[in-house]
UniProtKB/Swiss-Prot annotation:
This is one of the proteins that bind and probably mediate the attachment of the 5S RNA into the large ribosomal subunit, where it forms part of the central protuberance. In the 70S ribosome it contacts protein S13 of the 30S subunit (bridge B1b), connecting the 2 subunits; this bridge is implicated in subunit movement. Contacts the P site tRNA; the 5S rRNA and some of its associated proteins might help stabilize positioning of ribosome-bound tRNAs. One of its GO terms (cellular component) is ribosome. Part of the 50S ribosomal subunit; part of the 5S rRNA/L5/L18/L25 subcomplex. Contacts the 5S rRNA and the P site tRNA. Forms a bridge to the 30S subunit in the 70S ribosome. Coiled coil: none annotated. The gene is rplE. Keywords: Ribonucleoprotein, Ribosomal protein, RNA-binding, rRNA-binding, tRNA-binding. Signal peptide: none annotated. The keyword Ion transport does not apply. This is Large ribosomal subunit protein uL5. GO terms for biological process: translation. GO terms for molecular function: rRNA binding; structural constituent of ribosome; tRNA binding. InterPro entries: Ribosomal_uL5, Ribosomal_uL5_bac-type, Ribosomal_uL5_C, Ribosomal_uL5_CS, Ribosomal_uL5_dom_sf, Ribosomal_uL5_N. Pfam families: Ribosomal_L5, Ribosomal_L5_C.
Amino acid sequence: MAKLHDYYKSSVVAELTKQFGYTSVMQVPRIEKITLNMGVGDAINDKKLLENAAADMATISGQKPLITKARKSVAGFKIREGYPIGCKVTLRGERMWDFMERLISIALPRVRDFRGVNAKSFDGRGNYSMGVREQIIFPEIDFDKVDRVRGLDITITTSAGTDEEGRALLAAFNFPFRK
């Protein structure tokens, strides 16, 4: 079992129960899933770019990504409905905890000029979204084999009802919020 999950059960639950006055353990917010998304707009011209992006995402997440397709045709972007334009992965359970641990302790500190992540990127329901400009911050990605530096979106979905509860949950995991 992931160390972060054990830490959640032993320390975070007690800390949040005390802070928000929950009467049941089931009221305590928890991380439900982490979604990684990578949009590859250039995949219209070159299918190899999407394959490389999917391979990078599979390496980062540990599971095969789903290829996302365009929902509508947009003439300005020269895309048609059904064109493959990106990939996404939804992590739950053990892989989710492993990814969260690697994100907090290894990947984010490797970002150039890192001063913390924006504490205001919550959606109003306790879910946190952030973007990473380079996939090479993850140690699994070999810099020499990368054809192009791509970014990805990371969404952490929690069971928290408010942004305050979600922020407290992530802060309890020592998530590096900007001061």
